[in-house]
A protein has these predicted regions:
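Membrane-proximal HAMP signal-relay module
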Residues: 1-81, 85, 90-111, 115, ...
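Short conserved segments within the C-terminal catalytic ATPase subdomain
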Residues: 40, 162-172
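Short helix-loop "hinge" at the ATP-lid/N-box region of the Bergerat-fold HATPase_c
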Residues: 196-197
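Acidic ATP/Mg2+-coordinating residue in the GHKL
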Residues: 223
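Short beta-strand/loop element within the Bergerat-fold HATPase_c
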Residues: 203-215
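A conserved beta-strand-to-alpha-helix junction within the catalytic ATP-binding
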Residues: 50, 144-160
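Conserved micro-motifs of the catalytic ATP-binding
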Residues: 137-144, 177-184
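Short conserved segment of the HATPase_c
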Residues: 228-242
């Protein structure tokens, strides 16, 4: 009996001691799980821990600093490159317009060539504009109170001509408010809706639903297109990624719309993912935490 009690007491002590000893490791693991490209400087590990874990914490924090510097340099390069490209692209567009005005009568081959030049120059201009926006995201204040419902209706009005070309029905349900950048959230929902229209079937539907659930504001954009293959569902948020390159060119995309959407969601502390996708359509789900939204 005494032996059993000693064993039991030893087991209890070992449990509490091991729990205390492993607490810094659990804290370390929890912080690692929180790391995102937009919060590198906010997820550092406190270095005032047990000596055994102090070096782990220091190395981890140094790694975050290097990553943050790398991302900052990448954003700086992207912004500089976009700035440098804007002027020559503007000159090219002006020269094309001037040539067309001075030479209204040209051969069919020349007309086709000029049309191709205009399309590609406009595409490059849009790409440059988006890259510039992505490089400047962190300078945009996210402190405005935004009503999602009216914003969705405004987006539907702006995209109505595009939807009418394929006889796409635009539908919205629910509403909600949140704190953020009105300009960026408009761009987020505009990009998702435009994508859902462009890659939809003729006579299809685009449905945006807004709701509060599990302490989050949820926004879903559902289309009736042909779906996204399983291997590509995470890759679609990468810059310049295309599931079907030829189809993307036909639809006029530059491959940055969903990447910009991901950046905007991350800036607001949210998450974006492909919730469902099949041959019957795709649902893109966006969620914002309660500290960025309110009932």
């Amino acid at each position: 009996s005494d032996v059993y009690k000693r064993q039991l007491l030893g087991g209890v002590l070992a449990y509490f001691l091991s729990g205390h000893a492993l607490k810094p490791l659990r804290t370390f693991a929890a912080q690692v799980e929180k790391v995102q490209p937009n919060n590198l400087t906010d997820t550092k590990i406190p270095e005032a821990v047990l000596p055994e874990f102090r070096q782990f914490s220091r190395s981890f924090n140094q790694m975050l600093d290097r990553l943050d510097s790398g991302f900052a340099a990448q954003r700086q390069f992207t912004g500089n490159a976009a700035h440098e490209l804007r002027t020559p692209l503007s000159l090219m567009q002006a020269q094309l317009e001037l040539f067309s005005a001075e030479h209204p009568e040209v051969s069919p081959e020349t007309a086709d060539f000029l049309r191709l030049l205009r399309e590609q120059t406009e595409r490059m201009t849009q790409m440059t504009k988006t890259l510039l926006e992505m490089s400047e995201l962190r300078t945009v204040p996210c402190t405005e109170r935004i009503e999602i419902g009216p914003m969705v209706e405004e987006i539907f009005t702006d995209l109505a001509p595009l939807a009418e070309r394929k006889n796409i029905t635009l539908k919205a349900t629910g509403d909600g408010t949140m704190t953020g950048s009105d300009t960026l959230l408009y761009r987020l929902l505009y990009n998702l809706t435009e994508n859902a229209i462009r890659y939809n079937r003729p006579d299809g539907t685009v449905h945006i639903a807004v709701a509060y659930e599990a302490s989050c504001l949820h926004i879903t954009v559902t289309d009736t297109g042909c779906g996204i293959p399983q291997p590509y569902r995470e890759s679609i948020f990468q810059p310049f990624f295309r599931v079907d390159k030829s189809r993307s060119r036909e639809n006029g995309g530059v491959g940055l719309g969903l990447s910009l959407a991901w950046e905007i969601v991350a800036l607001h502390g949210g998450e974006i993912r492909v919730a469902e996708s099949s041959e019957k359509g795709t649902t893109i789900a966006v969620s914002f935490p309660t500290d960025a939204s309110a009932d």
